[in-house]
Design a protein with these regions (language model features):
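N-terminal ligand-binding/catalytic initiation module
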Residues: 1-92
Length: 92
């Protein structure tokens, strides 16, 4: 699995490239079910957002921790898994 840093992403994700990727994504045949929303505690929410096409599966996970400000941490913590459908391998 490859972990992509914000710095590495910023070097290749130009505004034009992002707009074109979004255009292609909206035209593609991609399944995007309603996100899962789970209150895991009084101060924590888990969001799961799956999507898939013939070639790829993606899963965005988000945890919203309303008490993180007092810990000097971001309220929203998130990650994205990209999986090859032909092998099941997590690639990023």
């Amino acid at each position: 699995m490859k972990v992509i840093s914000a710095e590495a992403l910023a070097k290749v994700a130009t505004y034009g490239a992002i707009v074109e990727a979004l255009r292609e994504g909206f035209r593609a045949d991609i399944a995007t079910p309603v996100r899962h929303h789970h209150e895991t505690s009084a101060v924590s929410t888990l969001l799961l957002m799956p999507a898939w096409s013939m070639e790829w599966t993606g899963l965005k996970t988000v945890v919203v921790k309303t008490d993180n400000a007092v810990k000097n941490l971001p309220t929203v913590q998130a990650s994205y898994l990209l999986i090859r459908n032909d092998t099941g391998e997590t690639v990023a």
